[in-house]
Amino acid sequence: MSFSSTAKAEVSKKLSQNSCCARAAAAAFLKFTGNIYELDGTFSFKTSFENAQTARSFFLLMKNGFSKHCEVSIKKNSKLQKNYVYTIFLPPSSDNIGVLKDLHFVRKGAKEYHLSFSLKEELVRKKCCRKAFLQATFLSCGSITNPEKMYHLEFDVKTKDDAEFLQKVLKSFEFEAKIVERKSHYVVYLKEGDRIVDFLNIIGAHSSLLELENIRIVKELRNNVNRLVNCETANLEKTINASMRHIENIEFIERTIGIENLPQNLQEIARLRIKYKDASLKELGNMLEKPLGKSGVNHRLRKIDKIAEELRKGGVVHAKPSHED
């Protein structure tokens, strides 16, 4: 089972059954997975789910929260023959108007009620109701990409109004969700791993939260190791390139004016550099008659580089034997 499916199975078991929260959750389920039908003053609705536990949660929500007994049908997914689609249907009845009134999906006209299938602020005034709304929204149209690959949580909704309503609910929990239009739908998404962890905490998916945190820790450790290896490799390459440059410059000086014409202090380090090509700067410094640290050795070698550069330009180097740096 995918990470997203596992998280949904966990949330399905924790869907709130409180009356106010039940209204917020039912509204999200119907809005994002269902359709409402109106015929001769009667109303019915149908929702479809690919997750059996989510379908069961909605069925129980209607039964316990609204005293409605829905019909359930199961058939194979036409696109994915291995999966099933669970359809929950509430048959037409004038009594169903009460449910839709609770969900603010109908408005009263001069003589009768009319369908108004849009989400209302009244549903999510309380924090507990906003949590229930997010639980049902995640179960209905949410998905989380495999965190081993990337951090991405998204909700696929039909209209811009739905996307902005969801964005506003997420904003109440300090989530800065983005909206992007994708073909005929709108996608509300979060990309930061720590924010997805916070979202899982809010909807009660604590086991999935811990799994994601473990994945994040391993990925961060792996990235740190790779960064360290890359840094060490870069430093090693830099050291090797510098050593090769020094040797090349010293050999050039030997062919032109001769190492013996360098100041005494530079002669000493030049001969050691040629003799011990693989030695580090620290090792070279310890070999000197008067030992030097890495920075002192590097300073002398840079002087040799400068002399070689002047010689290549055709300049004249007046070497003065010296023990000074």
Curated annotation (Swiss-Prot):
GO terms for biological process: cell division; regulation of sporulation. InterPro entries: Homing_endonucl, Sporu_reg_WhiA_N_dom, Sporulation_regulator_WhiA, Sporulation_regulator_WhiA_C, WhiA_LAGLIDADG_dom. Pfam families: HTH_WhiA, LAGLIDADG_WhiA, WhiA_N. Signal peptide: none annotated. Residues 280-313 bind DNA. GO terms for molecular function: DNA binding. Keywords: Cell cycle, Cell division, DNA-binding. Involved in cell division and chromosome segregation. Belongs to the WhiA family. This is Probable cell division protein WhiA. The lineage of its organism: Bacteria, Bacillati, Bacillota, Bacillota incertae sedis, Caldicellulosiruptorales. The gene is whiA.
